[in-house]
Amino acid sequence: MTSLKLLKEKAPLVICITNDVVKNFTANGLVALGASPAMSEFPADLEDLLKYAGGLLINIGTLTDENWKLYQAALKIAEKYNVPAVLDPVACGAGEYRKKVADDLINNYKLAAIRGNAGEIASLVGIDVASKGVDSAGVDNIDEIALAANEKFNIPIVVTGEVDAIAVNGEVVTIHNGSAMMPKVIGTGCLLGAVVASFIGLEKGQELKSLETAMLVYNIAGEIAEKHPNGHLPGTFKVEFINALYEITDEDVKEFKRVK
């Protein structure tokens, strides 16, 4: 069974501790894809929910001291129940405090994957890449960045940009699908982190397969959305992207995928 069919069959509960700007978009995107999102931020509630969860997303976009404690509490509970956790270290290359939080979560808690742009992941491994807030300039060595992070942390790594790279157990693949409209809509990267959390726990020992499917489904949905008559407009693209996540099939992935 393909990872996409497995996701739709299992409809995994995905706990999303994410930034305030993107909660609605993230929840709608996961529902469209076939997952079941919960946006809980109360540790006692998380203790109950994570018993049944298929994934946890920690997105540090809206960072506060209290949220840092929440991330730590959620990761402890997730490890207790063997729930795969995905970290999105938003803008960790833009300031010392964010880098400190990201380092803490990576070094002291169990993670199933890290998802970030080239600037974010490069900052975690000490590679110099131009980064401005949540955005990162296009880079040529995205596969090297992914491999360096994978080797340093021994965690599956997803690095996104004009080309995306996935590194698992020293193996790297690059994804050449996607839409130039994605950066025009706030939250597309954050939703991707939640999509990764939805796929990562579907098949134990098949992380590369699951992550590759997650990236292809997401990026090809973006291409489909952009092809809409008004897909070049951010408002239309946002709506059509959700529609494409709802309608995308394995046949679409097989036909349009560009993987190296």
Swiss-Prot record:
<dbReference type="GO" id="GO:0000287">
    <property type="term" value="F:magnesium ion binding"/>
</dbReference>
<keyword id="KW-0547">Nucleotide-binding</keyword>
<comment type="similarity">
    <text>Belongs to the Thz kinase family.</text>
</comment>
<keyword id="KW-0808">Transferase</keyword>
<comment type="function">
    <text>Catalyzes the phosphorylation of the hydroxyl group of 4-methyl-5-beta-hydroxyethylthiazole (THZ).</text>
</comment>
<keyword id="KW-0784">Thiamine biosynthesis</keyword>
<keyword id="KW-0479">Metal-binding</keyword>
<feature type="binding site">
    <location>
        <position position="187"/>
    </location>
    <ligand>
        <name>substrate</name>
    </ligand>
</feature>
<dbReference type="GO" id="GO:0005524">
    <property type="term" value="F:ATP binding"/>
</dbReference>
<dbReference type="GO" id="GO:0009228">
    <property type="term" value="P:thiamine biosynthetic process"/>
</dbReference>
<feature type="binding site">
    <location>
        <position position="160"/>
    </location>
    <ligand>
        <name>ATP</name>
    </ligand>
</feature>
<feature type="binding site">
    <location>
        <position position="115"/>
    </location>
    <ligand>
        <name>ATP</name>
    </ligand>
</feature>
<feature type="binding site">
    <location>
        <position position="39"/>
    </location>
    <ligand>
        <name>substrate</name>
    </ligand>
</feature>
<dbReference type="GO" id="GO:0004417">
    <property type="term" value="F:hydroxyethylthiazole kinase activity"/>
</dbReference>
<dbReference type="InterPro" id="IPR029056">
    <property type="entry name" value="Ribokinase-like"/>
</dbReference>
<dbReference type="InterPro" id="IPR000417">
    <property type="entry name" value="Hyethyz_kinase"/>
</dbReference>
<keyword id="KW-0460">Magnesium</keyword>
<dbReference type="Pfam" id="PF02110">
    <property type="entry name" value="HK"/>
</dbReference>
<keyword id="KW-0067">ATP-binding</keyword>
<dbReference type="GO" id="GO:0009229">
    <property type="term" value="P:thiamine diphosphate biosynthetic process"/>
</dbReference>
<protein>
    <recommendedName>
        <fullName>Hydroxyethylthiazole kinase 1</fullName>
        <ecNumber>2.7.1.50</ecNumber>
    </recommendedName>
</protein>
<keyword id="KW-0418">Kinase</keyword>
<comment type="pathway">
    <text>Cofactor biosynthesis; thiamine diphosphate biosynthesis; 4-methyl-5-(2-phosphoethyl)-thiazole from 5-(2-hydroxyethyl)-4-methylthiazole: step 1/1.</text>
</comment>
